[in-house]
């Protein structure tokens, strides 16, 4: 049975939604959860019937969001450090954390290490599409400065994740740029283009709107651009929701119309809700690591655990290693 370490302490709202999400996941799938954190706080949140189906790994410290990621390597009693060590030592098959993302990335890279062929890990963000499916964008924040070889590796990792975990038979890869023509872009994207066009599934340069229109499954960029795209998308989604609510309240007609559109709004909200997608896999490390939003609710944690289980079941790292072996980068 798959074993999953869950950092119970690092989220914005404390351990309650993390524990709840773990229990929701247990109700639907079989796995062994290791909740890592302060046992005195975690244990009262667990109903008696679940206490024999999970294990609490007691540690008193945790990395706060406002602290620097560099402090994590010295804080060996912190929840994310202890959870990472479980993964490093092979005591768990996957790690899920809604804590300090910088600390999670640093520890996963330094303590678990990188898989053979990966020079940089990448955060793989899942984005909603107009056709009801999802696309991937990577890197979404792990590497602000990249070389063309890194984008080539990101494309390989994204292709394998999209194919093996998300179920796309023939994923299409696009290079995020400021125009579709090969001549568009900066020095990085132009150099990367010549490498990427040798890959199966590469469709060329894509623009921001292609992330959502269903024309591409894997969108490749450096972490600086990717993180801006991710945060901008979140902001636009929140703004649209707020604007709709404000316009509805302006008149009685708006209120009545909203009642008739209630089911449509529910479906729209679900499609745009980050909790539906769980978290972002950190690809390129020698383990299955899922990084969740700090404000993750129980549903998001549940779905992040499901992501981790699928990654393990589909042997995503083994598939990425094979891809690197047959398509070596030339850094």
From Swiss-Prot:
<keyword id="KW-1208">Phospholipid metabolism</keyword>
<dbReference type="InterPro" id="IPR012281">
    <property type="entry name" value="Phospholipid_synth_PlsX-like"/>
</dbReference>
<keyword id="KW-0443">Lipid metabolism</keyword>
<dbReference type="GO" id="GO:0006633">
    <property type="term" value="P:fatty acid biosynthetic process"/>
</dbReference>
<dbReference type="GO" id="GO:0008654">
    <property type="term" value="P:phospholipid biosynthetic process"/>
</dbReference>
<keyword id="KW-0963">Cytoplasm</keyword>
<keyword id="KW-0594">Phospholipid biosynthesis</keyword>
<keyword id="KW-0808">Transferase</keyword>
<dbReference type="Pfam" id="PF02504">
    <property type="entry name" value="FA_synthesis"/>
</dbReference>
<keyword id="KW-0444">Lipid biosynthesis</keyword>
<dbReference type="GO" id="GO:0043811">
    <property type="term" value="F:phosphate:acyl-[acyl carrier protein] acyltransferase activity"/>
</dbReference>
<comment type="subunit">
    <text>Homodimer. Probably interacts with PlsY.</text>
</comment>
<protein>
    <recommendedName>
        <fullName>Phosphate acyltransferase</fullName>
        <ecNumber>2.3.1.274</ecNumber>
    </recommendedName>
</protein>
<dbReference type="GO" id="GO:0005737">
    <property type="term" value="C:cytoplasm"/>
</dbReference>
<dbReference type="InterPro" id="IPR003664">
    <property type="entry name" value="FA_synthesis"/>
</dbReference>
<comment type="similarity">
    <text>Belongs to the PlsX family.</text>
</comment>
<comment type="function">
    <text>Catalyzes the reversible formation of acyl-phosphate (acyl-PO(4)) from acyl-[acyl-carrier-protein] (acyl-ACP). This enzyme utilizes acyl-ACP as fatty acyl donor, but not acyl-CoA.</text>
</comment>
<comment type="pathway">
    <text>Lipid metabolism; phospholipid metabolism.</text>
</comment>
């Amino acid at each position: 049975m798959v074993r999953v370490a869950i950092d119970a302490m690092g989220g914005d709202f404390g351990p309650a939604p993390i524990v709840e999400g773990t229990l929701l996941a247990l109700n639907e799938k079989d796995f062994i959860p290791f909740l890592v954190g302060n046992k005195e706080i975690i244990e009262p949140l667990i109903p008696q019937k679940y206490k024999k189906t999970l294990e609490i790994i007691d540690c008193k410290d945790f990395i706060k969001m406002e602290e620097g990621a560099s402090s994590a390597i010295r804080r060996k009693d912190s929840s994310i450090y202890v959870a990472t060590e479980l993964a490093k030592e092979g005591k768990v098959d996957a790690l899920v954390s809604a804590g300090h993302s910088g600390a999670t990335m640093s520890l996963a890279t330094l303590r678990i290490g990188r898989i053979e062929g990966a020079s940089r890990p990448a955060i793989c963000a899942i984005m909603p599409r107009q056709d009801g499916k999802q696309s991937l964008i990577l890197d979404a924040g792990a590497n602000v400065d990249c070389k063309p070889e890194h984008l080539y590796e990101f494309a390989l990792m994204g292709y394998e994740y999209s194919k093996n975990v998300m179920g796309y038979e023939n994923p299409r890869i696009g290079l995020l740029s400021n125009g579709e023509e090969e001549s568009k872009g900066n020095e990085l994207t132009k150099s990367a283009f010549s490498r990427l066009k040798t890959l199966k599934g590469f469709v060329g340069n894509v623009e921001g709107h292609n992330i959502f229109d269903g024309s591409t499954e894997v969108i490749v960029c450096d972490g600086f651009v990717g993180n801006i795209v991710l945060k901008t998308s979140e902001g636009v989604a929140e703004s649209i929701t707020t604007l709709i609510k404000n316009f509805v309240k302006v008149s009685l007609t708006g209120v009545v119309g909203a009642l008739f559109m209630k089911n449509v709004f529910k479906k729209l909200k679900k499609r745009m809700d980050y909790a539906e997608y769980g978290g972002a896999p950190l690809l390129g490390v020698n383990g299955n690591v899922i990084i969740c939003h700090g404000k993750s609710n129980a549903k998001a944690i549940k779905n992040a655990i499901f992501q981790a289980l699928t990654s393990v079941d589909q042997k995503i790292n083994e598939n990425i290693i094979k891809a690197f072996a047959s398509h070596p980068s030339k850094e």
